[in-house]
Amino acid sequence: MGFKTKMQNLFLGNTDDLDELEYENDATINKGRGASQQEYDEYYEDSTPTVTQKEDPVRQSNIVPIHTKKAKSQVILSEPRVFNEAQEIGEHLRQNRAVIVNMQRMSKDQSRQMINFLSGVVFALDGTITTISQNTLLCVPNNVELAGSISNLLGEDDINHKGW
């Protein structure tokens, strides 16, 4: 026995017995006259490995489309009659919606309260509040940028309005 054979026997066990078993199985099929077609087919049917297709796991793509649809911005038109409706306007601002507030139907005291409340909400949200007309305000959250000025279109009497 050579060194290589000793190492194989140590790790794999004695392989001489396995070789003899394989030859014995082959001898039973051949029987000295050649195997019949049926014996040949039976032998190779049993020994053919079954092939199973391995499904590749579904890989999720890291590709993101360039032109994604952005969420639509909304502008809410509000015409409150009492100060109690101010909380609803504040909720719209918190949800990053611009709000136009028409206070023509409110009393002067309640419209002052509304302006004070909305000024606080807009300040807390880092937004902007702008007078559009005599009794109308535009309140926008920080995700909306205002450009331009309306005061140039108003007369001096409208700018110095003492209604509030």
Swiss-Prot record:
The keyword Ubl conjugation does not apply. One of its GO terms (biological process) is FtsZ-dependent cytokinesis. One of its GO terms (cellular component) is cytoplasm. Gene3D superfamilies: SepF-like protein. Residues 29-57 are annotated as: Disordered. The keyword Cell cycle applies. Pfam families: SepF (PF04472). It is found in: Cytoplasm. Keywords: Cell cycle, Cell division, Cytoplasm, Septation. Cell division protein that is part of the divisome complex and is recruited early to the Z-ring. Probably stimulates Z-ring formation, perhaps through the cross-linking of FtsZ protofilaments. Its function overlaps with FtsA. Belongs to the SepF family. Homodimer. Interacts with FtsZ. This is Cell division protein SepF. It comes from Exiguobacterium sibiricum (strain DSM 17290 / CCUG 55495 / CIP 109462 / JCM 13490 / 255-15). The gene is sepF.
